[in-house]
Design a protein with these regions (language model features):
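Hydrophobic transmembrane alpha-helices and immediately adjacent juxtamembrane helices
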Residues: 1-282
Length: 282
């Protein structure tokens, strides 16, 4: 049954996605039906991404790994580094891995509806699924890359603290933040085409405005307080605190949690009001 649905996804405009029997995946509009379709779409994204690649899964690891090695070399071997903690390579990876997830997801949000316009118009499943499939597929790639974090934690002699228990909380908050952000960005990019290029520029600036190659505590006043209101600062703090307890910053964590929830609800509200406009533009 899943094979039939997946075949339907491979052909643009094919309606077989919605022909899966209710007995197998639930009645139309049911959570079970939604989750089943979400999984099929996410699995398709992963399959397409790696089907023509000789390295396959390794690509989800190479990007953050190469970035980490470059920054480690520049800031430890070329220039004197005054920020971050030791082992610095582990310090980098704990933030770069979730950043790659965030960056890849937001980049794909800008094409979420235009890429599969015919399916978006013709299928009966809720259209928010075209955003959530990106969050899920990129999130799975993030989870696949975690062995790199474990390997460097062992090789670099990193120590584990109680904060590691907050790692799942960070994943949950980032998922909520991305879903809300996607429900805002995706429809707006259909209505205003220039927003796709604008988003790329914002992401480039956001990388350096987010505590990745440095920590929140490394910033001088008043930039430390300003940075705390970047929701990614609090989320990335939760990822790091399991290996670097001194990186804990209550203000940034609270702000990250609150903003993630607010953006999620704002995204749902925005999407409901823009959905008709999106369908007219597609």
């Amino acid at each position: 049954m899943s094979h039939v649905a997946l075949q339907g996804l491979r052909g643009a405009g094919d309606h077989r996605l919605v022909s899966v029997s209710s007995a197998a995946v639930g009645a139309p509009g049911s959570p079970r039906r939604y989750l089943h379709s979400l999984w099929l779409l996410s699995a398709r994204d992963l399959r397409v991404r790696y089907a023509t690649s000789a390295l396959g899964y390794l690509w989800s690891v190479l990007d953050p790994l190469v970035m980490s090695l470059i920054y480690w070399f520049v800031f430890t071997q070329v220039f004197h580094r005054g920020a971050g903690e030791e082992p610095y390579i582990l310090f980098l990876i704990t933030a770069l891995l979730p950043w790659v997830w965030f960056n890849a997801a937001v980049s794909d949000f800008t094409r979420a509806f235009n890429k599969d316009a015919r399916l978006v118009r013709s299928t009966a499943i809720p259209r928010s699924i075209w955003v959530n499939r990106i969050v899920l597929s990129k999130g799975i790639e993030f989870l696949f890359s975690l062995p790199v974090l474990v390997a460097f934690a062992i090789l670099a002699g990193g120590t584990v603290s109680w904060g590691l228990l907050l790692f799942p909380v960070a994943v949950l908050l980032q998922t909520m933040f991305l879903v809300g952000l996607g429900l805002i960005v995706a429809p707006l990019c259909v209505i205003w085409g220039d927003l796709e290029r604008t988003t790329r520029l914002i992401l480039r600036a956001l990388f350096y405005a987010t505590p990745i190659i440095y920590g929140v505590s490394d910033l001088p006043a008043p930039f430390d307080a300003i940075s705390a209101f970047n929701p990614l600062a609090g989320i990335f703090t939760l990822y790091r605190v399991g290996f670097f307890p001194a990186q804990w910053d209550t203000l940034s964590v609270v702000v990250g949690a609150v903003v993630s929830v607010v953006v999620l609800f704002l995204g749902v509200w925005t999407f409901k009001r823009l959905e008709r406009s999106v369908l007219k533009e597609l």
